[in-house]
Swiss-Prot record:
GO cellular component: cytoplasm
Subcellular location: Cytoplasm
Binding site for Ni(2+) 2: K217, H246, H272
PANTHER family named in the record: UREASE
Record organism: Citrobacter koseri (strain ATCC BAA-895 / CDC 4225-83 / SGSC4696)
Stored CDD domains: Urease_alpha (cd00375)
Pathway: Nitrogen metabolism; urea degradation; CO(2) and NH(3) from urea (urease route): step 1/1
Active site per UniProt: H320 (proton donor)
Entry binding sites for substrate: H219
UniProt name for this protein: Urease subunit alpha
Note accompanying the cofactor annotation: Binds 2 nickel ions per subunit.
Principal subcellular localisation of the protein: cytoplasm
Length: 567
């Protein structure tokens, strides 16, 4: 067999087993763990290449071949870092393995035929589309901004730029839930809505789930009392939905211990568990130690930088309808912004004690920076703390798997949608993001939604080729016309499906049911299941694990920043 150099092979077919790839301009390096394509039998599209009739393309009809093949891609997911071909059929991932013509090639698991389109994955990284579980639906344009960052699923609540939505992620009541389901029907992302969980009458909560909400949000601005927490969780246990909690910063209705007592042993998703985004001051961060609490961060405190503290006060005053001329409002804001707990948050992510990242879109968070900021934290922690103890070899594979799980599979598990999205696995909706390694986590090369390209960088439309400047992201055919309804999902509760809500509202998009929300625990959070013994000093706010202080230094320079956004 003829041999070529490793560099020449990587240039032609992408990296293979043992090759290392740098992620953007970070200090994170991944190493290919396995290559499922066969040396000498690789498929590639183009003039004089392999995917031609009678060669890499077989004679089978459409029913026997995939609709789309992504060739020689480097998959980065919670389960591995693997080189493979990816086959997509009927909008879902058909297989991950070896593509080609089974009539003449061995071990083909992804048949290519006349009905197959090809996307060149050589030299590209493929990840699952991100899942952002903390969306304030203040404006519909957030969907586009999130999509071009690599997020394909958005869970949250709201009704537009109302005071309630500016502060809380709730879509309150059946009428608003119906209108928002109709409004979101043509947005190019998967969507699920959270109803308002602040109430002590279970029927007022049940009717929101029956109307189409996939969960309930309890927010202190509506009153996060122990009674409301208990009521929402009681309904959740009945109807298999998730509850998200923004707890009581002011400790008016109780302290963190009272909230934990109200929760009991029932699963709950605690938002911005560090506390700058809201929650019992100063020790809501201790909630991450409990087996039934699924802790997430929002991105304004990620990573901790020299500007983090100064930025937060004004953000908080605006988002929570506070008055800078009222001393009590200023004191409320200042109680939430603690340098010590923010400095500990990055470390808790690196240890796998915090399980999810999210945005808090336009309500103290940036909807287009969930992925970017997650990787900035990973970079900062490698620089400050060195390689993880679990690493083997000269790579950061275990750290990368930990961090990618925070915005893909773990939020999907938390909200009962992991059977549909959240990872690059056969059977799931083909929501995939292609990245050039130099732009990983910052600017995607191609966004695939339900098997179709939904958005991509595109050059001058009047040019003779697709690449001349100006190049910017444009919607593609997967985001247009009736096709968009086939390429996205609206998530509903089982009760809403049984009530025929999609038919009542004339929803055109495909729907999917959330399930398993009440059985998921911290131990199920992939690569992020640590339950540390954590304490916070009430006077100094110092955070300790098993008696040892944990902190990090603020960054004054970050990767994935200015050099990527000059134009």
């Amino acid at each position: 067999m003829t041999e070529i150099s490793r560099q020449a092979y990587a240039d032609m077919f992408g990296p293979t087993t043992g090759d290392r790839v740098r992620l953007a301009d970070t200090e994170l390096w991944i190493e290919v763990e396995n290559d499922l394509t066969a040396y000498g039998e690789e498929v590639k599209f183009g003039g004089g290449k392999v995917i031609r009739d009678g060669m890499g393309q077989g004679q089978m009809r459409a029913r026997a071949c995939v609709d789309l093949v992504i060739t020689n891609a480097l998959i980065v997911d919670h389960w591995g870092i693997v080189k493979a071909d990816i086959g997509i059929k009927d909008g879902r991932i058909f297989a991950i393995g070896k593509a080609g013509n089974p009539d003449i090639q061995p071990n083909v698991t992804i048949p290519i035929g006349v009905g197959t389109e090809a996307i060149a994955g050589e030299g590209k990284i493929v990840t699952a589309g991100g899942v952002d579980t903390h969306i304030h639906w203040i404006c519909p344009q957030q969907a586009e901004e999130a999509l071009v960052s690599g997020v394909t699923t958005m869970i949250g609540g709201g009704t537009g730029p109302a005071a309630g939505t500016n502060a809380t992620t709730c879509t309150p009541g059946p009428w608003y839930i119906a209108r928002m389901l109709q409004a979101a029907d043509s947005l190019p992302v998967n969507i699920g809505f959270l109803g308002k969980g602040n109430g002590s009458n279970p029927d007022a909560l049940r009717e929101q789930i029956a109307a189409g909400a996939i969960g309930l949000k309890i927010h202190e601005d509506w009153g996060a009392t122990p009674a409301a927490i208990d009521c929402a969780l009681t309904v959740a246990e009945e109807m298999d939905i998730q509850v998200a909690l923004h707890s009581d910063t002011l400790n008016e209705s109780g302290f963190v211990e009272d909230t934990l007592a109200a929760i009991g042993d029932r699963t709950i998703h605690t938002f911005h568990t560090e506390g700058a985004g809201g929650g019992h001051a100063p020790d809501i961060i201790t909630a991450c130690a409990h087996p039934h609490i699924l802790p997430s961060s929002t991105n304004p405190t990620l990573p901790y930088t020299v500007n983090t503290i100064d930025e937060h006060l004004d953000m908080l005053m605006v988002c929570h309808h506070l008055d800078p001329d009222i001393a009590e409002d200023v004191a409320f804001a200042e109680s939430r912004i603690r340098r010590e707990t923010i400095a500990a948050e990055d470390v808790l992510h690196d240890l796998g004690a915090f399980s999810l990242t999210s945005s808090d879109s336009q309500a103290m968070g940036r909807v287009g920076e969930v992925i970017l900021r997650t990787w900035q934290v990973a970079h900062r922690m490698k620089v400050q703390r060195g390689p993880l103890a679990e690493e083997t070899g000269d790579n950061d594979n275990q750290r990368v798997k930990r961090y990618i799980a925070k915005y893909t599979i773990n939020p999907a598990l938390t909200h009962g949608i992991a059977h549909e999205v959240g990872s690059v696995e056969a059977g799931k909706l083909a929501d995939l993001v292609l990245w050039s390694p130099a732009f990983f986590g910052v600017k995607p090369a191609t966004l695939i939604k339900g098997g179709m390209i939904v958005c991509a960088p595109m050059g001058d439309i009047n040019a003779s080729i697709p690449t001349p400047q100006p190049v910017h992201y444009r919607p593609m055919f997967g985001a247009l016309g009736a096709a968009r309804h086939h390429c996205r999902l609206t998530f509903l509760s089982q009760a809403a499906v049984e009530n025929g809500i999609a038919q009542q509202l004339n929803l055109r998009s495909a729907t999917a049911v959330v399930k398993g929300c009440r059985t998921v625990k911290k131990a199920d959070m992939i690569h992020n299941s640590l339950q540390p013994n954590i304490t916070v000093d009430a006077q100094t706010y110092e955070v300790r694990i098993d008696g040892e202080p944990i902190t990090s230094e603020p960054a004054d320079v970050l990767p994935m920043a200015q050099r990527y956004f000059l134009f």
